[in-house]
Amino acid sequence: MVEWTDDERAIINGIFSNLDYEEIGRKSLCRCLIVYPWTQRYFGGFGNLYNAETILCNPLIAAHGTKILHGLDRALKNMDDIKNTYAELSLLHSDKLHVDPDNFRLLADCLTVVIAAKMGAAFTVDTQVAWQKFLAVVVSALGRQYH
């Protein structure tokens, strides 16, 4: 079990309290699909992903990005039990969707870039430490079924 300090909890809650889920979710998923084009293979049913412009304008990608952030919100509300919170989602991604678990880390990295850009100077070293810890726990929980 991961131990969270009061400061870490406050930082992570602070990040989420200022997030525009639609904007940040869309930008993060789009960035992941553009920067790491091999991740597009999991989104074959989302229509044309031919180039960066079509990805950025794709409403299904935008909606899924928002859905991902709402999924992270579940981790926020269950910080002391993220592993069990994501047990079902881990099963879905491993057994049904066959998602390479490394892609969770790639998306987490893209999310960090987008949030850091949005927060600017407020994304301090301490903020990044807490945020990276949170995402590492989420990524581990999502990849749990693969172990």
From Swiss-Prot:
Gene3D superfamilies: Globins. Disulfide bonds: none annotated. Heterotetramer of two alpha chains and two beta chains. The keyword Transcription regulation does not apply. GO terms for molecular function: haptoglobin binding; heme binding; metal ion binding; organic acid binding; oxygen binding; oxygen carrier activity; peroxidase activity. It comes from Melanogrammus aeglefinus (Haddock). Residues 3-147 form the Globin domain. InterPro entries: Globin, Globin-like_sf, Globin/Proto, Hemoglobin_b, Hemoglobin_oxygen_transport. GO terms for biological process: hydrogen peroxide catabolic process. Belongs to the globin family. This is Hemoglobin subunit beta. One of its GO terms (cellular component) is hemoglobin complex. Red blood cells.
